[in-house]
Amino acid sequence: MKNKKRILSGLLAAALVVPLFAGGAQTAAAAEAAGKTLDVVFTHDTHSHLNSFSTVIDGESTEVGGFARIKTVIDEQKAENPDTLVVDGGDFSMGTLVQTVYEDEAAELRMLGAIGCEVTTFGNHEFDYRSSGLAQMLKSAAESGDVLPELVVCNVDWDAMEAAGLNDGQQQIQSGFEEYGVKDYVVLQKGDVNVAVTGVFGVDALACAPTCELLFRDPVEAVRETVAEIKANEDVDMIVCVSHSGTWEDESKSEDEILAKSVPDLDLIISGHTHTELAEPIVHGDTYIVSTGEYGRKIGELSMTQKSDGRWEI
């Protein structure tokens, strides 16, 4: 059965920022009594919207979004809790004129690093400039010397591609992955909480990426194996998945809901791709699914507390 909790939402507007997901403030004593805590800030589907832009809200033109405002929220949160986890769910590129310098400047990925994003994954639009464009973007980012987010994706099927013989495009992306340091997962220490973050590229995302030359494993199977690897080899308190798969109204076709039900050891899924804006998380068992819309109009923020059984709750 799908359980839901009510949480808050708000726009990244000029004078006021209200987090999309807010678990509620806790006193230090209450947090200690409840167990370990982790604050998370997240974005997805920002689509090259590095600058603020105007939209109509309640009949009035309002300036929203922009990485400067997002950074302000992140900085304010980190001033309160330096161990806040900041992640992104992919499709950080393609959507404004900024995309014209995607290959040579890697502006979107470098800006994610500049605002404090620690981990992101690939969306379908990262493949819009074909294999050569993605590979060059990764190399440009790596060569910039800037602080960059980790890039994670666990279901690229390199074994199948290598068995068949890598074509030119696949070789280019493999080289870009190696130069950037793309991984199946990473482990981050956030205060007293060790967090594993993996990433996955969804079935519909692949269908929306006709220029993508990579082969991918089934997302559920790949995440299940990666989670098993994490549990066998890493000492972690929480497992997070930045997923570019999405949710749909039809639960039987809702990829990240299928993932949550199929891999119950996941604690949190940051769900990108469908540009969904969830005013409250979707919950299956002990797995929370959260989404915050598109273009950086809103930013997700939540606080999780570890329960006595080791699982987490908002």
Model-based region annotation:
Residues K4, A14-A15, K71:
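Low-complexity, intrinsically disordered short peptide segments enriched in small/polar/basic residues
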Residues L20-A34:
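Sec-dependent signal peptide cleavage junction
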Residues M1-L11:
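Bacterial N-terminal signal peptides that target proteins for export
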